[in-house]
Amino acid sequence: MGKTSRDKRDIYYRLAKENKWRARSAFKLMQIDDEFQILKGVRRAVDLCAAPGSWSQVLSKRLYEEDQEAKIVAIDLQPMAPIPGVIQLQGDITSVDTANQVIKHFSGEKSDIVICDGAPDVTGIHSLDEFMQAELILAAFNITSHVLKEGGNFLAKIFRSRNSSLLYAQMKKYFKKVYLAKPRSSRQSSCEAFVLCLDYSPPEGFVPTMGKTSLDATDASAISPDIIDGFVTCGDLSGWDSEKSYPLDIDACFPKGEIDEEQKKRYEFKDVVQPPTDPAYKAALDKKKSGVFAKMSADLNRQLKAELSRGKDQKKTPAENVPSVEELEKAAEKFQL
């Protein structure tokens, strides 16, 4: 596969690199904001699960254009390359200490908006992925209840499923309006969407806590069909299609043929704006590049062949020829895995 193939298959990936966004997800936030104006008048914003930082970039660009005194706090477990004007916290969003640090950076005040584009590493088992995403939204809501001011807004990624209406009903207990937003840059074939909760109004007597394992119980059978205030598609319908492949020649693929001289420049491949600084998979990649896994595989194959050969001589069953767990652990220890 050529290095330009993804530029052809994913126009938003290509545009993100050309416009110096760290990820294509920047367009999702911009399209939601264009539709709902959720960043208008915001002076304090929190970006949860922020790495690699594309949503923080959008916050920085749009908030500082309107108010130079705005403050932005980005939180992630992983380290993230610096972004001008963004305060970065490497911490756990399930920790009260992290919430206290946010409020400290805001000089004792609470945030106008909390956004979260986080998602678990998907397994391909849809029910499990949906459950893990729901757990992440719960964690995001828990810290949001500590740092969001009344009247503030909350935006989070969700994976749509048959149980999604329960989540909307639960959120409606804390926010006056709940929308389901689907940006144009989010692939239509994906179950990804964004729950947008407007005007934070917690119930009387509500005490924020990080210990919640679920939102307040709601009888799913009693959910009203109008629990969501609207399903909204965001973005220009005549614009780029996230499902379509485009030619590298910008003249041939620009919608409606409306391009200026700057956009007519010859296509040039660009690397990603900001690769991960210290990804969790880096150690595994280093071991793979150094040949550790190949050596381990070869060693185990030799051991298995020897056992099979010995088994034939001693007439062992196939199950008896397989290396034991202890033998595999010794092999792994040998290669420092």
Swiss-Prot record:
- Reply yes or no: does the keyword Transferase apply: yes
Q: Does the keyword ATP-binding apply?
A: no
- GO-annotated molecular function: S-adenosyl-L-methionine binding; tRNA (cytidine(32)/guanosine(34)-2'-O)-methyltransferase activity; tRNA (guanine) methyltransferase activity; tRNA methyltransferase activity
Which EC class is this protein assigned? transferase
User: Where does the record locate the signal sequence feature?
Assistant: none
A cellular-component GO term for this protein = cytosol
Its EC number is 2.1.1.205
Reactions catalysed, semicolon-separated, are:
cytidine(32)/guanosine(34) in tRNA + 2 S-adenosyl-L-methionine = 2'-O-methylcytidine(32)/2'-O-methylguanosine(34) in tRNA + 2 S-adenosyl-L-homocysteine + 2 H(+)
Q: Where in the cell is it found?
A: Cytoplasm
Binding-site list for S-adenosyl-L-methionine: G53, W55, D76, D92, D117
List the active site. Answer: K157
The annotated regions of Basic and acidic residues compositional bias extend over 304-318, 327-337
Name of the protein this chain belongs to: Putative tRNA (cytidine(32)/guanosine(34)-2'-O)-methyltransferase
